[in-house]
Curated annotation (Swiss-Prot):
One of its GO terms (biological process) is DNA restriction-modification system. Belongs to the TdeIII type II restriction endonuclease family. Transmembrane segments: none annotated. It is an enzyme of class 3 (hydrolase). This is Type II restriction enzyme HgiBI. It catalyses: Endonucleolytic cleavage of DNA to give specific double-stranded fragments with terminal 5'-phosphates. One of its GO terms (molecular function) is DNA binding. Keywords: Endonuclease, Hydrolase, Nuclease, Restriction system. It comes from Herpetosiphon aurantiacus (Herpetosiphon giganteus). This system is less active than isoschizomeric RM.HgiEI. Pfam families: RE_TdeIII. The keyword Hydrolase applies. Its EC number is 3.1.21.4.
Length: 274
Protein backbone atom coordinates (compact mmCIF):
# COMPACT_ATOMS: atom_id res chain seq x y z
CA UNK A 1 0.00 0.00 0.00
CA UNK A 2 1.53 3.31 -1.12
CA UNK A 3 -0.51 5.40 1.35
CA UNK A 4 -0.47 3.97 4.86
CA UNK A 5 -3.59 4.05 7.09
CA UNK A 6 -2.34 6.93 9.26
CA UNK A 7 -1.63 9.10 6.23
CA UNK A 8 -4.97 8.14 4.68
CA UNK A 9 -6.74 9.47 7.76
CA UNK A 10 -4.68 12.67 7.70
CA UNK A 11 -5.62 13.23 4.07
CA UNK A 12 -9.29 12.53 4.79
CA UNK A 13 -9.28 14.99 7.69
CA UNK A 14 -7.62 17.60 5.52
CA UNK A 15 -10.08 17.14 2.63
CA UNK A 16 -13.07 17.23 5.00
CA UNK A 17 -11.77 20.50 6.43
CA UNK A 18 -11.22 21.86 2.91
CA UNK A 19 -14.80 21.10 1.86
CA UNK A 20 -16.19 22.58 5.09
CA UNK A 21 -14.23 25.75 4.44
CA UNK A 22 -15.56 25.92 0.88
CA UNK A 23 -19.13 25.47 2.12
CA UNK A 24 -18.61 28.13 4.77
CA UNK A 25 -17.33 30.65 2.22
CA UNK A 26 -20.18 29.76 -0.12
CA UNK A 27 -22.84 30.15 2.58
CA UNK A 28 -21.68 33.71 3.23
CA UNK A 29 -22.39 34.72 -0.37
CA UNK A 30 -25.99 35.12 -1.44
CA UNK A 31 -27.20 34.25 -4.91
CA UNK A 32 -29.82 36.50 -6.39
CA UNK A 33 -32.64 34.51 -7.91
CA UNK A 34 -34.37 35.78 -11.05
CA UNK A 35 -37.84 36.88 -9.99
CA UNK A 36 -38.82 39.16 -12.83
CA UNK A 37 -37.31 41.21 -15.66
CA UNK A 38 -37.49 44.47 -13.71
CA UNK A 39 -35.98 43.56 -10.34
CA UNK A 40 -32.94 41.42 -11.22
CA UNK A 41 -31.17 43.70 -13.74
CA UNK A 42 -31.71 46.73 -11.49
CA UNK A 43 -30.12 45.06 -8.44
CA UNK A 44 -26.52 45.72 -7.36
CA UNK A 45 -23.62 43.33 -6.67
CA UNK A 46 -20.35 44.36 -4.99
CA UNK A 47 -18.77 41.12 -6.28
CA UNK A 48 -19.77 41.76 -9.88
CA UNK A 49 -21.53 38.41 -10.14
CA UNK A 50 -24.85 39.39 -11.67
CA UNK A 51 -25.72 37.19 -14.64
CA UNK A 52 -29.18 38.20 -15.83
CA UNK A 53 -29.26 35.98 -18.92
CA UNK A 54 -27.91 32.95 -17.05
CA UNK A 55 -30.31 33.49 -14.16
CA UNK A 56 -33.31 33.86 -16.45
CA UNK A 57 -32.61 30.52 -18.16
CA UNK A 58 -31.06 28.33 -15.47
CA UNK A 59 -32.77 27.26 -12.21
CA UNK A 60 -31.26 28.88 -9.11
CA UNK A 61 -30.31 25.49 -7.66
CA UNK A 62 -28.16 24.72 -10.71
CA UNK A 63 -26.58 28.17 -10.55
CA UNK A 64 -25.63 27.52 -6.91
CA UNK A 65 -24.06 24.17 -7.79
CA UNK A 66 -22.14 25.77 -10.63
CA UNK A 67 -20.80 28.54 -8.42
CA UNK A 68 -19.71 26.07 -5.75
CA UNK A 69 -17.97 23.87 -8.32
CA UNK A 70 -16.01 26.84 -9.67
CA UNK A 71 -14.97 27.88 -6.18
CA UNK A 72 -13.98 24.31 -5.32
CA UNK A 73 -11.93 23.96 -8.49
CA UNK A 74 -10.03 27.15 -7.73
CA UNK A 75 -8.94 25.85 -4.32
CA UNK A 76 -8.37 22.25 -5.36
CA UNK A 77 -4.76 22.89 -6.36
CA UNK A 78 -3.81 23.56 -2.76
CA UNK A 79 -5.13 20.12 -1.78
CA UNK A 80 -2.76 18.48 -4.26
CA UNK A 81 0.19 20.24 -2.63
CA UNK A 82 -0.75 19.16 0.88
CA UNK A 83 -1.59 15.59 -0.13
CA UNK A 84 1.73 15.41 -1.94
CA UNK A 85 3.57 16.54 1.18
CA UNK A 86 1.79 14.06 3.44
CA UNK A 87 2.42 11.12 1.10
CA UNK A 88 6.04 12.11 0.46
CA UNK A 89 6.80 12.09 4.20
CA UNK A 90 6.14 8.34 4.21
CA UNK A 91 8.60 7.69 1.37
CA UNK A 92 11.34 10.31 1.65
CA UNK A 93 13.54 11.99 4.25
CA UNK A 94 12.14 15.51 3.89
CA UNK A 95 9.03 17.01 2.26
CA UNK A 96 8.27 20.74 2.48
CA UNK A 97 5.75 23.04 0.82
CA UNK A 98 6.57 26.57 -0.35
CA UNK A 99 10.29 25.90 -0.09
CA UNK A 100 12.55 28.92 -0.61
CA UNK A 101 16.06 28.81 -2.04
CA UNK A 102 18.12 31.95 -1.60
CA UNK A 103 21.27 32.23 -3.67
CA UNK A 104 23.76 34.75 -5.00
CA UNK A 105 24.65 34.21 -8.65
CA UNK A 106 26.47 36.31 -11.19
CA UNK A 107 24.32 39.05 -12.64
CA UNK A 108 24.91 37.65 -16.12
CA UNK A 109 23.40 34.27 -15.16
CA UNK A 110 20.15 35.78 -13.90
CA UNK A 111 19.99 37.93 -17.05
CA UNK A 112 20.64 34.92 -19.29
CA UNK A 113 17.71 33.05 -17.74
CA UNK A 114 15.40 36.01 -18.31
CA UNK A 115 16.64 36.33 -21.89
CA UNK A 116 15.94 32.66 -22.60
CA UNK A 117 12.40 33.02 -21.24
CA UNK A 118 11.91 36.16 -23.35
CA UNK A 119 13.05 34.24 -26.44
CA UNK A 120 10.51 31.49 -25.73
CA UNK A 121 7.81 34.09 -25.06
CA UNK A 122 8.35 35.82 -28.40
CA UNK A 123 8.38 32.53 -30.26
CA UNK A 124 11.76 33.20 -31.85
CA UNK A 125 12.46 29.48 -31.89
CA UNK A 126 10.15 26.96 -33.56
CA UNK A 127 10.50 24.65 -30.56
CA UNK A 128 11.43 25.39 -26.96
CA UNK A 129 15.01 24.20 -26.32
CA UNK A 130 15.52 21.42 -23.80
CA UNK A 131 16.43 22.32 -20.24
CA UNK A 132 19.90 20.88 -20.80
CA UNK A 133 20.43 23.05 -23.88
CA UNK A 134 19.34 26.16 -22.01
CA UNK A 135 21.49 25.34 -18.98
CA UNK A 136 24.51 24.87 -21.24
CA UNK A 137 23.90 28.36 -22.64
CA UNK A 138 23.66 29.83 -19.15
CA UNK A 139 26.85 28.12 -18.02
CA UNK A 140 28.80 29.26 -21.09
CA UNK A 141 28.18 33.00 -20.83
CA UNK A 142 30.96 35.38 -19.67
CA UNK A 143 30.51 36.41 -16.03
CA UNK A 144 30.47 40.01 -14.83
CA UNK A 145 31.78 39.34 -11.34
CA UNK A 146 28.75 41.14 -9.92
CA UNK A 147 26.59 38.97 -7.67
CA UNK A 148 22.84 39.31 -7.27
CA UNK A 149 20.80 37.53 -4.62
CA UNK A 150 17.38 36.13 -5.49
CA UNK A 151 14.88 33.91 -3.70
CA UNK A 152 13.24 31.13 -5.71
CA UNK A 153 10.22 29.34 -4.25
CA UNK A 154 9.17 25.80 -5.15
CA UNK A 155 5.68 24.49 -4.42
CA UNK A 156 7.18 21.27 -3.08
CA UNK A 157 10.69 20.22 -2.06
CA UNK A 158 11.68 16.61 -1.43
CA UNK A 159 14.96 15.25 -0.16
CA UNK A 160 15.29 11.54 -0.75
CA UNK A 161 16.99 9.18 1.69
CA UNK A 162 20.07 9.11 -0.56
CA UNK A 163 20.35 12.91 -0.31
CA UNK A 164 19.15 13.65 -3.86
CA UNK A 165 16.67 16.49 -4.24
CA UNK A 166 13.39 16.97 -6.10
CA UNK A 167 11.69 20.31 -6.74
CA UNK A 168 8.12 20.56 -8.03
CA UNK A 169 5.96 23.35 -9.38
CA UNK A 170 2.44 21.90 -9.08
CA UNK A 171 0.24 23.76 -11.55
CA UNK A 172 -2.82 23.41 -13.76
CA UNK A 173 -2.79 20.72 -16.47
CA UNK A 174 -4.31 23.35 -18.78
CA UNK A 175 -1.96 26.27 -18.20
CA UNK A 176 -1.79 29.65 -19.84
CA UNK A 177 1.28 30.77 -21.75
CA UNK A 178 2.25 33.00 -18.82
CA UNK A 179 2.08 30.10 -16.36
CA UNK A 180 4.31 27.98 -18.57
CA UNK A 181 6.91 30.74 -18.87
CA UNK A 182 6.85 31.39 -15.12
CA UNK A 183 7.42 27.71 -14.33
CA UNK A 184 10.22 27.40 -16.88
CA UNK A 185 11.93 30.44 -15.37
CA UNK A 186 11.75 28.89 -11.89
CA UNK A 187 13.07 25.54 -13.09
CA UNK A 188 16.01 27.21 -14.83
CA UNK A 189 16.76 29.26 -11.73
CA UNK A 190 16.67 26.18 -9.50
CA UNK A 191 18.97 24.21 -11.79
CA UNK A 192 21.38 27.15 -12.10
CA UNK A 193 21.50 27.64 -8.33
CA UNK A 194 22.09 23.92 -7.84
CA UNK A 195 24.60 23.47 -10.69
CA UNK A 196 27.48 22.79 -8.26
CA UNK A 197 25.43 20.50 -6.02
CA UNK A 198 27.18 17.35 -4.82
CA UNK A 199 23.90 15.39 -5.01
CA UNK A 200 21.56 14.76 -7.98
CA UNK A 201 18.89 17.43 -8.45
CA UNK A 202 15.70 17.27 -10.52
CA UNK A 203 13.07 19.98 -10.98
CA UNK A 204 9.68 19.46 -12.62
CA UNK A 205 6.46 21.12 -13.73
CA UNK A 206 4.00 18.71 -12.09
CA UNK A 207 0.36 18.16 -13.06
CA UNK A 208 -1.80 16.19 -10.63
CA UNK A 209 -3.86 14.63 -13.43
CA UNK A 210 -4.21 14.47 -17.21
CA UNK A 211 -7.54 15.92 -18.45
CA UNK A 212 -7.29 13.92 -21.70
CA UNK A 213 -6.64 10.43 -20.34
CA UNK A 214 -4.33 8.24 -18.32
CA UNK A 215 -1.38 8.04 -20.70
CA UNK A 216 1.16 10.77 -21.37
CA UNK A 217 0.60 10.29 -25.11
CA UNK A 218 -3.03 11.42 -24.72
CA UNK A 219 -2.05 14.85 -23.33
CA UNK A 220 -3.17 17.56 -25.75
CA UNK A 221 -2.31 21.04 -24.45
CA UNK A 222 -0.51 22.75 -27.32
CA UNK A 223 0.43 25.66 -25.04
CA UNK A 224 2.30 23.38 -22.65
CA UNK A 225 4.09 21.63 -25.48
CA UNK A 226 5.08 24.92 -27.10
CA UNK A 227 6.25 26.88 -24.07
CA UNK A 228 7.90 24.20 -21.90
CA UNK A 229 10.46 21.47 -22.34
CA UNK A 230 7.57 19.02 -22.33
CA UNK A 231 9.65 15.86 -22.73
CA UNK A 232 11.98 16.54 -19.82
CA UNK A 233 10.41 19.13 -17.53
CA UNK A 234 6.78 17.99 -17.26
CA UNK A 235 5.40 15.06 -15.24
CA UNK A 236 1.68 14.27 -15.46
CA UNK A 237 -0.76 12.28 -13.36
CA UNK A 238 0.46 8.83 -12.43
CA UNK A 239 4.10 9.51 -13.33
CA UNK A 240 4.08 12.49 -10.96
CA UNK A 241 2.48 10.61 -8.08
CA UNK A 242 4.86 7.69 -8.61
CA UNK A 243 7.78 10.04 -7.95
CA UNK A 244 6.10 11.08 -4.71
CA UNK A 245 5.26 7.56 -3.56
CA UNK A 246 4.76 4.36 -5.53
CA UNK A 247 3.07 3.33 -8.83
CA UNK A 248 -0.25 2.82 -7.02
CA UNK A 249 -0.21 6.22 -5.26
CA UNK A 250 -2.35 7.94 -7.91
CA UNK A 251 -5.24 5.45 -7.78
CA UNK A 252 -5.08 5.16 -3.98
CA UNK A 253 -5.33 8.93 -3.64
CA UNK A 254 -8.28 9.05 -6.03
CA UNK A 255 -9.99 6.46 -3.83
CA UNK A 256 -9.51 8.70 -0.80
CA UNK A 257 -10.94 11.73 -2.61
CA UNK A 258 -13.91 9.58 -3.70
CA UNK A 259 -14.53 8.29 -0.18
CA UNK A 260 -14.55 11.83 1.19
CA UNK A 261 -16.83 12.96 -1.65
CA UNK A 262 -19.33 10.20 -0.92
CA UNK A 263 -19.31 10.97 2.79
CA UNK A 264 -19.88 14.69 2.21
CA UNK A 265 -22.29 14.46 -0.73
CA UNK A 266 -25.50 14.63 1.31
CA UNK A 267 -24.31 17.68 3.25
CA UNK A 268 -23.14 19.44 0.09
CA UNK A 269 -26.38 18.74 -1.73
CA UNK A 270 -28.51 19.87 1.20
CA UNK A 271 -26.66 23.17 1.59
CA UNK A 272 -26.58 23.99 -2.10
CA UNK A 273 -30.12 23.01 -2.99
CA UNK A 274 -31.93 24.29 0.07
Amino acid sequence: MAINPITRNKIKDYLNSFIQQQLSVYSQRSLREFQDVDSYPSSLSKDGDLKPFHASLIPASIMRLNRFERSLSTGLGSTFEECTRLIALDHHAVALRNYDIQAALDQAQWAAIDQLISTIDRGLKHQTPSLNQMLEQIQSIPLTGILETHIVRADLYIQRHDGSELFFEIKSPKPSKGQCLEVMQRLLRIYTIKQQSAVPVKAFYAMAYNPWGISRASYRSSITKKYTDFSNAVVIGQEFWSLIGEPSTYTELLEIYHEVGLAKSAEITQKLLQ
